[in-house]
Amino acid sequence: MATISNETPLWRLQQTLNHILPQSVRKNEKHLAVVHGPTQPALWEMTLGELLEFQCLRYRDLEAVVVPWTAARWTYGQLENESSHLARGLLAKGIQRGDRIGVMAGNCEEYVSLFFAAARVGAILVVINNTYTDAELKYALSHTACKLLFIVPRIGRHDLKNALEDLHSPDISKRLPNLNETVMIQGSFKSFGTYKDVILAGNVVPLSAVQRRQDTLSPFDVCNLQFTSGSTGNPKASMLTHHNLINNSRFIGDRMDFTEYDILCCPPPLFHCFGLVLGLLACITHGAKVVYPAETFDPEAVLRAISDERCTALHGVPTMFEAILALSRPDSFDCSQLRTGIIAGAPVPRPLMKRLWNELNMTEFTSSYGLTEASPTCFNAFTSDSIATRLTTVGKVLPHASAKIINPETGETVKIGERGELCMSGYQIHKGYWGNLEKTAEALIEDEDGTIWLRTGDEAVFNSDGYCTITGRFKDIIIRGGENIYPLEIEERLTAHPAISRAAVVGLPNKHYGEIVGAFLVLEPGHTCPPDDEIKNWTRQTLGRHKAPKHVFVFGLDPRLPLDMPQTGSGKIQKQVLRDLGKRLVGEE
């Protein structure tokens, strides 16, 4: 039963009495790098199906989901109705509580309907990365034992014909014994059923059956598996609950001052927390509207959506914003309503931020930090924070969450102002990795008070006001001659050069120093490449000599490189790919 109160049992929140005290920093933690979010507003205790029903009571006739590339415009009432019909179809297909349903598709209204339909019948939706190869798709289906797969023939330029042929082969039941059926969420392929077929199959199932199933569910049930973008080994599937997602998305929307009058343009993909939680659910929890401008990221479609839909917010990673700003805008372009949004996934160069402010009117943009295992957001700036704060920090910890910074070797909490590994605790921490107890035990640690902490693997520092600055990934730190070099400060210096749009700095092997600095660059449109010496001298003007890049590689100019910076499907730069590439190009000197 849905409730909105602050009487949730404390053990469910993995919190002790100390954990929920309202003080930002407690007396016995003075000077230590420990911060606690506010305890108000109270956490919501409901399932995703109950959330949608609850919001329909207030916003039934307001638009909830708009998809310009399919011409879909669904109100809250239509979304509830569509997901109810699909939920009946899932019951007709024999889906039980806890069964896994996979989806691999671009941003579309059917994806949103499936997300809520699966949640309403107690299934776990496995969102599969659009960029996965055939082998990675099969691994995801096998690892999570999906019973149903919803898929499309093509996602942008990614042709899935070979994968579909394999899924249609006679021996697929031997290789994927749990997969009962493949369904085309859009389009068609041979004898596979379609999304509409599933809805038709549900006509024999009464709506009351969906309600009965929904009444058996708990907000603390796992409802979503999201694969982490690990650099080595098979990806891990993070187990996220209704409670995780609903409350995290609420607090994200609160930081952007969302109301039912807001309209979010959301280019990030639905298979990622950015598009699903910070996008879709941040809107649903506030009665706002989400606009998915294209199947995959298309900067021209984003500009059209901002103008045509009168969007008030825009999400993206820095590379998306750079692509948007690189386009010429027609005279009719109107971004006068645009004010806020979240920029995440990578540090934001100051020149880019100035352009977002001046050219797109994003005066209330917010910086953010999160990871899949934390549902995802841990820290988010306020729209009222100063520009300097939003540029140099990721804001303050969200409500009902705690954060601390530890010495990664000793586990001891460091002092405020000292760098260390960021750890998170609170309602938003995932239940672990699906089918991987070993990795779960490595990431989730219990302190002497019985509080569970998630080790993020990210290096961070807190200031005396509780604001957090992410200083890098521990695995990305370059150790040159025994001295730690932090790539982020070099990247920020490089992108301050007028000719450099993006920079990624990695450590390359060196016999004498162990590692040396390598820089991969993308130039600003219309600029010529500065000589290597100029780039090194530019770095040395503000940083130590040893931090200047020994090797410089420029995308678009070096024929040995791909055309653009390698990224994950969610827009994060793949530094492991760059390290491997640099190692092949220069060897070990």
From Swiss-Prot:
A motif (PTS2-type peroxisomal targeting signal) lies at residues 12-20. Keywords: ATP-binding, Ligase, Nucleotide-binding, Peroxisome. One of its GO terms (molecular function) is ATP binding. GO terms for biological process: fatty acid metabolic process. Substrate binds at residue 372. Its main location: other. Its EC number is 6.2.1.-. CoA binds at residues 481-483, 547, 555-557. GO terms for cellular component: peroxisome. PANTHER family: ACYL COA SYNTHETASE (EUROFUNG), ACYL-COA SYNTHETASE. This is Acyl-CoA ligase SID4. It comes from Ajellomyces capsulatus.
